[in-house]
Amino acid sequence: MKYQFSIIVDPATYDNEGLSNGIDLRKNNFTHLEDRGAIRAQQDWATHIAPIKQFKGTLGHDYSFMTVCVPECIPIRLEIISYANEFAFMYDDDTELDTENNTSAENDKLMGTFLAGTQGWSPPQDQSSSGKTRILKQLFSEMMEIDKECAIATMKAWAEFLRVGSSRQHGTVFTRLKDYLPYRIKDVGEMFWFGVVTFGMALHIPDHEMDACHKLMEPAWIAVGLANDVFSWPKERDASQRLGRTHVVNAVWVVMQEHGFSQEQARQYCRELAAQFVAQYLDNIRNIKNEESISPDLRTYVEAMQYSISGNVIWSKFCPRYNPEKRFNQTQLDWMQNGLPSTVELDGASNTSSSFLSTSTHGSPASGSQTTIESKDGWTADSSGIVSLLLNCSLPPLSHKVISAPLTYVDSLPSKGTRDMFLDALNHWLHVDEQRASQVKMAIRMLHNASLMLDDVQDGSRLRRSKPSAHRVFGVAQTTNSAAFLVNESIKLIRELAGDQGVAAVLEKLTSLFVGQAQDLHSSRNLSPPSLTEYIQTIDQKTSALFELASRLMCLCSTATVVPNSSLSRFCILLGRFFQIRDDYQNLTSPEYTKQKGFCDDLDSGTYTLPLVYAISQQSENFLLQNLLSTRLAEGTLDDDQKRLALDQMQLVKTNEFLRKILDSLYDELRAELQCISSSFASENPQMELMLMMLKL
């Protein structure tokens, strides 16, 4: 991991009380940007929600929260994540003295505001919630302007935090630490902080690595939660007393009940336990430092999070929030009392300086790493060794390293994660246990990756998610063989997961996939455009089929008492159609798609997408367009000038406008179908709402 924006603080200047041994304290060089973001959030809260009384948030005289907890935050992003974090602290204080039911209702309302705000509509809410809506819209707008992809991932993480954490169980009386700690990981803000750090450092953690991320980070979050409980104990104890509660949702209180300790004994016990989890976490960092099977961004995230541990400890010791005798520094006081300056420079550089707009802060494996080559036993001058080997019928099977290499490559490429998000949203209704849900995700990902590899070979695609397609790295034969192996492995996994019914489902959908692909290839090879009906049938047998299979497998594993299979099937079919037509449209119009797959990649492959099918149907005697397709078939590709000419011909009949209308209609129908399914389950599904919002153009 590279260190560009922070310095190490002299350890002689602070005492970490044994809570972050082995971890440096680092401090961001642009702390004034945190001051600006936090104070701006306070002012907006006071303007749009309610006056602030005796609030002490994230700022500190020498150590403000974000400055030491995310020391490698890219400066251009520091102000906005500090704004978000200060809002979270104010929201937490605002709900701290409320009942559990009211807090949960407020969380649901805020999640609804979050979803509604990003879609441009506002449900009727009270004055206070409307103010929060306004603040969130401003927050998301600024984040999207900086980095849309990271911002959407962060919103998803924050929505998950509101769903599972954010004081939802503050009415629960925990009396055993082993019951309390899993809750504390969620409530301390694991997913909120994940969103903050990944946005602040421009990190992109693939969805398929989230389980690994949770496991690697678990000891860190326990350590942070315990340390936070040690320092916040007086504040939270007093708040519970004011509310008339007989318990405190804090590890110190839990340890007092479980072991009969005094307050100070319980705090010391928590300190010692936190130190043990810090040691476990540092082991995790060392173990994955050069582990290339883990994405560089996940390795960076895991390494960077150690500074959240040390930063949280030192901030907690010196912040006015937990230490009433501490004061803010003069700049902070001036800005709080007299208002913020109109702009803040990044130490002499404009805050739009390109030097701060980097989108990656990866480290790289140590240059001195070595590769171990296995010796080839048996090859000796003495033939007896060879004969002995030939007569040994118990040799172990070959390693899967070679056959898995193309699969590992494709799986490592950045992904929108739509299918994983779809499965998570389905599980909101279906209640599949975590292990089986993860297996369904794995099986669907395996089939999806296999289809990508085969499609790229058959379509001649040069790029996949902005990287060379697998067959251009490993060759057509190896890629095809690996894809077939992946299909085989997915069937084995599904058999273990869902038995004969699962195997029947996957074989049915594999048949659909192959038949749909055959229709696609036939049309391209023979310059035979499909009818609109044939085009939709092809989508249903390819894109929709995988969504249907995912839904069917989840239903087979579900513990829900009522499952509206026909409605789910219709939703999956419509979702597949929307997803594919959106992809067709984006392939011809989106700069991001050009970066990922090349300029108008579908025209290179000769695929009859909906834009092409529509344009041909509307101008059957457009010989120019027909001859461009013939040239593509003869030469195997079109150059950019030829593609631009084809686009011009399609726009003669306003193809793009037609597609937008189709997509809008499909989107409206998807939302209506979602409401019907939600009614059948008697449960709204914010995650599915969020997924649709993210797909909307």
From Swiss-Prot:
Low complexity bias: start-end ranges: 351-364
Chain positions covered by the region annotation Substrate: 184-187, 232-236, 321-322
Membrane-spanning ranges: none
Alphabetical list of CDD domains matching this protein: Trans_IPPS_HT
Keyword flag Lipid biosynthesis: no
Pathway: Mycotoxin biosynthesis
Region feature Geranylgeranyl diphosphate synthase, mapped onto this chain: 331-697
Entry coiled-coil feature ranges: none
EC number: 4.2.3.43, 2.5.1.29
Molecular functions per Gene Ontology: geranylgeranyl diphosphate synthase activity; lyase activity; metal ion binding
InterPro entries: Isoprenoid_synthase_dom_sf (IPR008949), Polyprenyl_synt (IPR000092), Polyprenyl_synt_CS (IPR033749)
Pfam families: polyprenyl_synt (PF00348), Terpene_syn_C_2 (PF19086)
Residues reported to bind Mg(2+) 2: 92
Substrates-to-products reaction catalysed: geranylgeranyl diphosphate = fusicocca-2,10(14)-diene + diphosphate; isopentenyl diphosphate + (2E,6E)-farnesyl diphosphate = (2E,6E,10E)-geranylgeranyl diphosphate + diphosphate
Annotated segments matching region Disordered: 351-376
Keywords linked to the UniProt accession: Isoprene biosynthesis, Lyase, Magnesium, Metal-binding, Multifunctional enzyme, Transferase
Binding site for isopentenyl diphosphate: 416, 419, 448, 465
Binding site for dimethylallyl diphosphate: 464, 542-543, 580, 587, 597
Region (Fusicocca-2,10(14)-diene synthase) location: 1-330
Keyword Metal-binding attached: yes
Residues reported to bind substrate: 92, 228
GO biological process, one term: isoprenoid biosynthetic process
Binding, Mg(2+) 1: 92
UniProt similarity note: In the N-terminal section; belongs to the terpene synthase family. In the C-terminal section; belongs to the FPP/GGPP synthase family.
Protein name, per record: Fusicoccadiene synthase
